[in-house]
Amino acid sequence: MRVLVLAVMAIVLSGTAARAADPRYPDWPCTQAKVPEISLAAVWAGPPLDEVQSKWKDHAKISALVAKLSARKTPLDEAEKLVKEFLAASASDKTANAKLLFAGLFDTLNAQRSQVINGLERVSRKQREAADKIREETLALQALQGVTPRDDAKIEALSNELIWKTRIFEDRHKVVRFVCEVPTTIDQRLFALGRVIQQEME
């Protein structure tokens, strides 16, 4: 039982030790630095988008293409091919369509990224609460073990509950580590598609 208590504490402490590497973002659980939004200048070196930024939604074909290109289930090489085919068929409207397409991608992927970041921070807060609860229950278990006479049924029930909560905590921790990669993947997709759009405009 002492081994269980030590193992639980080790798992909880390891799961929360890396939290809040940047004091500006106390709920950010990832080792990667938190970048709340993608900067347009970091992913687009083409002509200014000011006049088209809010107009891409008015074009049904472009809106549908943006949705397909933004979906993570669409492989990047397929997305790049779709961009080339769309712009090749745009003829005299190529520059205007290219700008609308990128404006749509920028808006959509930035919004996706914000949802992922907000979700990660929500889970991080839940993990902190779970870690606090597990610590409390571990101390309660230690106290029960020191009481004479021992209430073995109560000790076993609390031990089983701790094992269950620790397993959930560990599973969430693994998911968070995986999801921490998603904002970077979105950045890379936007940069790659922006580069293809700019190349097709030239």
What positions do the PLM features span?
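Short, charge-rich amphipathic alpha-helices with coiled-coil/heptad character
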Residues: 88-117
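Alpha-helical oligomerization segments
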Residues: 153-202
